[in-house]
UniProtKB/Swiss-Prot annotation:
Residues 1-17 form the signal peptide. Residues 18-41 form a propeptide. Keywords: Disulfide bond, Ion channel impairing toxin, Neurotoxin, Potassium channel impairing toxin, Secreted, Signal, Toxin, Voltage-gated potassium channel impairing toxin. This is U2-lycotoxin-Ls1c. It comes from the Eukaryota. The keyword 4Fe-4S does not apply. It comes from Lycosa singoriensis (Wolf spider). The keyword Signal applies. Expressed by the venom gland. InterPro entries: Toxin_34 (IPR013605). It is found in: Secreted. Disulfide bonds join C51-C67, C58-C97, C60-C83, C69-C81. GO terms for molecular function: potassium channel regulator activity; toxin activity.
Amino acid sequence: MIKYVLISALLVVAVYSFTIEDSEDALLEEAEDELDTEEERRMALPPGAVCNGHKSDCQCFGAKYKCSCPFLWRFRRSAKCHCKKGWAWTAIKKRSCHNRYQWSG
């Protein structure tokens, strides 16, 4: 009986240590995301400018502008993404951008 209690306690401690480690990783990721949003707040790229395809569409100036990348752009070195006009749903998606005050009237 005591063996089962000890094994159960060890399992609880092991699971607890993993959850603490995961929460620390999550806090670090949140801090990095906050830094990225600070950069997005500071500047928005004009239409036609080269943008980073790995980041959100918030980097492009305007409610309907999005970062548009060519087909298989990740595998071609010369391929670059540009801020181009998107559809109406792009404006709906960009309502949650932190830098929307720059282009909203």
